């Protein structure tokens, strides 16, 4: 690509930025706390795709971008790159989550029961006010509500396929992975992937460009405690409590190399409450790592190369929007090549 330096437009760019800030003055009147509490799913989406858990910063980013969630995630990701790293926390076990909502479409009767929690899945999608005024729920203390996955009984019976763990956990925030892509890198990429992109890829596998029709073995939203080894005392301390979503999808039974038949599963996890993203991630996990659903490059979602390079919203938006920047030299060279080719063709005649 060719670029050309622009000097004369510096003042125009400055004025454009000032005008943009002027048009967003009404956004500044909105309190950050109101965004956090009133637009919680938007905040969760930005934290997940921005790869930084901070409701306050995500809310500020939403205000700064006037509700453009892709742009807000960009702000948050950029801020993340400037944060100092002090260490690595202990791995979160989703079986130890304090559950606010947890259901299974694979099993009717499960340990702890079906906990519907707060959801509008069962609501008619009409824009009406005050249609659910009566409060008929029972209060429960989520601090004591710790239940293992509904698929755990099958796992204890050794009926579920286990994938081999990576010898070394990748960190895509430090080094972008290269082929062959470790599963830890793929899962990290999906964890901070753009929800719409992941839904689109997952849907291709369901609708006809693949062969996935999963059953939700266990999907849960709630809080997880983050623990960290103190650098001085060397004791394990609690450093944060995160809202998270985790999903285990059950695929189908698959014959293993040792001849045993086991159930394939996919796993999805993300910051905040975003069940659609977690389900999509679990479906993509199935398509990428289960031979039953993977048929080479015939299906979009079965191609790790396709997936890992096309689901990041910040990357996709950044590169797409860069086409608005000056490409004068590039286009002029195209015109020159066309002109020369036309002249050459005329001379040959």
Spans of features found by a protein language model:
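Acidic, serine/proline-rich low-complexity intrinsically disordered regions
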Residues: 140-349
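Short, amphipathic alpha-helical interaction segments embedded in low-complexity terminal/linker regions
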Residues: 1-223, 251, 345-349
